[in-house]
Each structure stands twice: as structure tokens, then as C-alpha cells.
Amino acid sequence: MATLPVLPLTDAVLLPGMAIPVTLDPTTQAAVDAARATGDQRLLAVPRLDGEYGPVGVVATIEKVGRLPSGEPAAVVRGLARARIGSGVPGPGAALWVEAAELAEPAPAGRARELAREYRALMTSVLQQRGAWQVIDAIERMTDLSELADSAGYVSWLSLAQKTELLAAPDVTTRLELLVGWVRAHLAEQEVAEQINTDVREGLEKSQREFLLRQQLATIRKELGEDEPEGSADYRARVEAADLPAPVRDAALREVGKLERASDASPEAGWIRTWLDTVLEMPWNTRTEDNTDLVAARAVLDADHAGLTDVKDRILEYLAVRNRRVERNLGVVGGRGSGAVLALAGPPGVGKTSLGESVARALGRRFVRVSLGGVRDEAEIRGHRRTYVGALPGRIVRALREAGSMNPVVLLDEVDKLAVGYSGDPAAALLEVLDPAQNHTFRDHYLEVDLDLSDVLFLATANVVEAIPSPLLDRMELVTLDGYTEDEKVAIARDHLLPRQRERAGLTADEVTISDGVLARIAGEYTREAGVRQLERSLAKIFRKVAVTATTDPAPVHVDTGNLHRYLGRPKFSPESAERTAVPGVATGLAVTGAGGDVLFVEATSMAGEPGLTLTGQLGDVMKESAQIALSYLRSNGRRLGLDPNALAGRRIHLHVPAGAVPKDGPSAGITMVTALASLVSGRPVRPEFGMTGEVTLSGRALPIGGVKQKLLAAHRAGLTEVIIPQRNEPDLDDLPAEVREALTVHTLADVADVLALALRPADLDADSLDGEALATA
């Protein structure tokens, strides 16, 4: 145990065998002076990291005291042996004195030499990269393993913490293990850094080479008198010559200025050129002249589509207003609130998408279709900001660029199929586009200049109105396309579908003919849809079979109702209301689905068992509540309705709505359920020609419902002749086509008692129908 002055080291770690210079400040100067005063000039060098002394230091001797080339006082000290720091003791001078016990070094373990061999090899690889051949020779000459390990104190890329860890490890095997791991990690980092440097160097060399080649190419073109490719000067001339709004021109000239300052090899130059090309391709002040002939516009719409009176009238109103404003010099181009947005809602196949092209033809405008089905990124509407690689303008800007005018007809197809994704809600981005009060200053993220959309006629199509977000629907004028009557389907098939499918099959009118009777039968018995897509597929099937026959028999083919089954097989649909309602407990209801209106049967039966109500057919909560209301109404009002009040007592009631795989919901089946239960209790079947729809209350009132037109069209297609609807839905009958109004007898009733009196067959005393008591015991 020796008493030595402490030499604190804050920016170095001294290991045994090392000699390092130490700059002298008052603290280190005091330690050096104290050591020199003892005669043996020994002191204890201790690393001091983050203000704390380590547990192990090095007994060192002072070899020289003098000044550095910078003039600062310094001393050279050499490490002798590791020593553990003991407690402080008093001593002469201002230095800190402590007791120090030298640490004995254990004998090297058996694997120490293997570690030393690996350490030499790794250090040789590191030093070869730096060209330190003399250091390599010195390491190879070291035979003492402890000396070899402690020589790592000279390595510059080891941190002070790592060197302190080496100092605190007296076992040479432990030190060599630490060094091998550190050198391996350093070599891996060096390889990565070298690869990065190589890639950067190759990239710079490639850029320099391309720059020199471009300069040479420019010189060669100049000598040959060839035109140079578009540069910043050319873009400036194009911008100044283009017919651009003043704010857009200013923004474009600013970008041209950036292009002039940017290097040709810079990626930013390419982005600026792409942006300028997009701006210059936009039809900023180009507008087509609208057709002012309302008669001609109506003729175009009628020629392309049968029916759809509401849509056609709205287009003609829009055109008439614009013509009147032109005549009175009120101005129609642009301006706040001057746009128009129509939403065409209806089942598939009714012609919503094709109607957009007809509207454009009728107005004399260009037409662009923007498909929105499945779009889930807000940037698809507003565009990507130019900070992103591969940024593009949004679909609205691209549609205007494609149209080549600022007043096209833009069809936003399948707007109800928009989806919310992690990149935002595209429906929310459409709010500004479709708001006539805002879209005169629409700003695309890519262009970042105001774009006037107020003169664009937007048409949006949707199958399910409820799927459109309410704020978006509020900005559109809703026009409902409920489907076609049978006469309209025949006209569409005769004038459009039949010629198109005949031409696709490679046939002529002389080779095959189809009568209107066949078209009517296909529409009524082979298809049951609101639109005409399945009708067109049926015609295509007929023409394909005729084409096959024509290869062996060139005789003309006439398809009539007698031979239609040869081409399409047996009819797929037939009136089934009479068969289904022939027994008590079955009523025919009307419903609206995503494919239009449809007929819905409600079946009721009762059985002995625990009293209660069983509901099947995948009914939603609202429909289940309607069934409960219907049953409660009959139980409380049975005697007033002429029904046995005890017929339902102690019985299990089962209510089923067929097509069990299809989910169903809504309140409009209320009176149908009451009628089915009343038919079950009374034993009087429902009249087969009747269909009905309406919500019911506990007091027996028939409340209004929606989708009346679609439901009545479905009743007409299904062969029903009489329909019951709530009295408050009577104004909806004005929307019915004249053909359907003539074919259907519509009863508007306010009380369910009147519904039962009208819909149930009269009681027949001679029939084998069950009375209430017989039913209760059946």
C-alpha cells in the first residue's frame, strides 16, 4: 500500500506501458509538484469522467516536464501498473493524496493466446486500411499479452468509457475479449462507411461525367446549328405568350426564375419543368359555347335515353337559365354560386353513367368521366404536394386538362363507393369541389393556384343515397332514377340494345329479326330488374346462338314468342303472388333494395307451445320492432276488427320473410305484417292481386314511407294490379309514369282496419277456411 498524489485525467485514459502528455492546470500542476517533491516522482493517474473518479487508476512516473509547442505547460507521464484507489490521506502541498494498492495480474487463461491471435489479425485489417505499417510491425513484435492488450489505449476510435473499462479489467483474457468485440464492430462500421463513400463517389463521378457530356453535346448542337431542347428561356417565353390568369402567370414566372437558378442536373429542375408543363397544358381561359337550342337539346336526350323525364327537365332548365342570362347580358362565365351539381341516384343499369355523355352532347360541351369507386386517398381529389417524389395533380385538375376546357361536363361516377383510408377522406375533399359557393377558388395541392370550377357541370352517380355522407349530399341536387317500365325497356331494347348487340355478333338486320313481343316477354319473364343490363345480356345470348346457327344454315332467323325458349330456355320469373297468398297467413309487401324495388312476401303461422314471437329471415332491428307492433295491435284491437281475441292466446307465433340469406330492415313492412297475422287469425287469405307497403303504429295508423315510385314499379313488374300505400304518400303518385298509373289501382289508406277490410278475402261460410277457434286448436 503506497500513498500517492492523484493526477486527474479528464480527456485521456492512461494504461500501463503508455506514455502520454498531460496539460498542466492548477490541479494537475499540484499533483506533479507533489510527486517531484517525493524524489521517486510517482503519482496515481486516475480517469475522471463526468466529474467522477474511476475505481482503478495507474501508478505512473513523471518522465519530463516542459512546455508544448503552443506554450502551455505540460508533463509526460508513463503508466507502470494498475492500482485500486483507497481512502484519502493528508499530504504536503495542494494535491489530493490517496492510498493505492497495486493490482496483481492473474496468469493468462488458455484461450488468451487465441484471442491475442484474433486481435492481432483484426487490428492488422484496421491498420492496413489506414496504411499504418509501422504500427502493424510493433504489434507483431509484442509477445507480452498484457502489453498487447494495454497498447489499445493508443487507439483513437475507442471511447474514453471503453478505455476506462479496459483499465478496470486486470485479467488479460477479459481485456482481449472486449477488444475483439469492439474491433469487429468497428470493422463492420468501416465496411458500411466505405460502401457509402464508394456509392457517393461513383454518383459524383457520374454526375460530373453527365455534366461534361451535356456541355459537349450543347457545343456540338451549336456547331451544327440544331435547336436546343427546352430550357428556362424557352419556358419564360411560353409563359409570357400563354393566355394565363394574372395570379397563375405570376406563380409560373416565379417558378421559371427558380428554374433559371437551378442546375440542369438538379432533381428540382425536373420537378419545376413538370409543374410548368402541367400549368401550360391547363385550359385556363378556354370555354366551349353552349348549345342554345332547347329543342335540339331535348331531341338529343330523348334519342339517347327513354324516360328519365326529371333529369332531362333539369338539364333543359339549366340551359334555359344560361341562355336567358346571355340574352340579358348578365354574364354566365364563372362567379360565386353559378355552378350546378346534380346527383343521379338509382339502381344499377338504369343509365346513370351513359346519361352523362348525353348531357354533354345536348349542351355542346366536352365530357370527362372520373371513376371514384374504391378511392380512399384524399390526394386523389386534391393532388399531391410537390415535396413528394412523383407528385401529380388531383383527378379534378386532370379531368379539366383532358377536357381542354373550363366548362366541361364532369361525371363523378360511383360517388357512394368512396372509402375512408389512412390517407384521409376523399369525400371530405369533394366538399369544396362540389360547393358552388366555394369552388370558384378551388386550390389543388400540386398546382397551388386558384382554379375556377364554377362553370363546370358536375354529375354524380350513386346506387345508394344513404351511403353518401350528409355534408356532401347537401351540396348536390338529388335526382332519383327509379327504373324503367316495361314499355320503356322495350323501347330501349329496340332502339339501342338490339342494334348494338346485333353488330357485336357480326349479324345484320336481314339475318335475324326480333319482334317487340319477344322483347316484352324477355323483360317480363326472363329478367326482373330496374335497369336493362340483364335484358342486354339476354339479347347478346340470343345473337350468339344465332351466329352459331348461321355458320351451318344461312337462312334468315326470326325470333318470336314461340321459339324464344330455344335461345333462352324456360322463363325464370312468373307471377307467384296468387300461388303464395292462396293460404291464410301470407301477404305481399313491397320493398326497396340496392337493385331497385322488389316484391316481399311475409308468412305467418302459429303452433302450440310457449307463447311468444319467433322471427326469421335475417330481419333488422327496425323490422323486428314492426313485427312486435303488428302483434300487439292485433291482440289489443282484435275484437274491433272482427277477429277472435283468444285466437293468439297461448300460441307460439312464427313470422318469416323468405329469401332468408338476404338481410332486410326498415319500417315499411308494418302493414304487411299486420295483414299476414290478421289473415292467419281470421283464416281469410289475402287477395292475390294486392301488394302493400307502409309503417304501422300501435294505434293502427299507416305512416308514410320512402321509395314509393320504385315499389310501385316493382309491383307492376311482378304482375300486381292493386297496391295499398299510406294516405300521406299520395303526392308521390305524381312521379309515376302514366303507363304504371293506368295499370295499377292504388289505394291510399290511413288506418290499418281499412287495409284489412280491403286486402282480405270476404269470409265464405261454405269454404273450408278455419275460424279463429279452430285455428287456435289446430
From Swiss-Prot:
The induction annotation reads:
By heat shock.
| InterPro entries referenced in this protein's UniProt entry, alphabetically | AAA+_ATPase, ATPase_AAA_core, Lon_bac, Lon_bac/euk-typ, Lon_lid, Lon_proteolytic, Lon_Prtase, Lon_prtase_N
Tell me which PROSITE patterns the record gives: LON_N (PS51787), LON_PROTEOLYTIC (PS51786), LON_SER (PS01046)
Question: What reaction is this protein's catalytic activity?
Answer: Hydrolysis of proteins in presence of ATP
**GO terms for MF:** ATP binding; ATP hydrolysis activity; ATP-dependent peptidase activity; sequence-specific DNA binding; serine-type endopeptidase activity
Which cysteine-cysteine pairs are annotated as disulfide bonds in the entry? Answer: none
> What region holds the Lon N-terminal domain?
4-187
The protein's Enzyme Commission number: 3.4.21.53
Where in the sequence is the signal peptide annotated?
none
Identify the residues that bind ATP. 346-353
PANTHER family, alphabetized: ATP DEPENDENT LON PROTEASE FAMILY MEMBER (PTHR10046)
Q: Which family does it belong to?
A: Belongs to the peptidase S16 family.
Q: What is the annotated role of this protein in its UniProt record?
A: ATP-dependent serine protease that mediates the selective degradation of mutant and abnormal proteins as well as certain short-lived regulatory proteins. Required for cellular homeostasis and for survival from DNA damage and developmental changes induced by stress. Degrades polypeptides processively to yield small peptide fragments that are 5 to 10 amino acids long. Binds to DNA in a double-stranded, site-specific manner.
Specify the protein name: Lon protease
Organism of origin is: Salinispora arenicola (strain CNS-205)
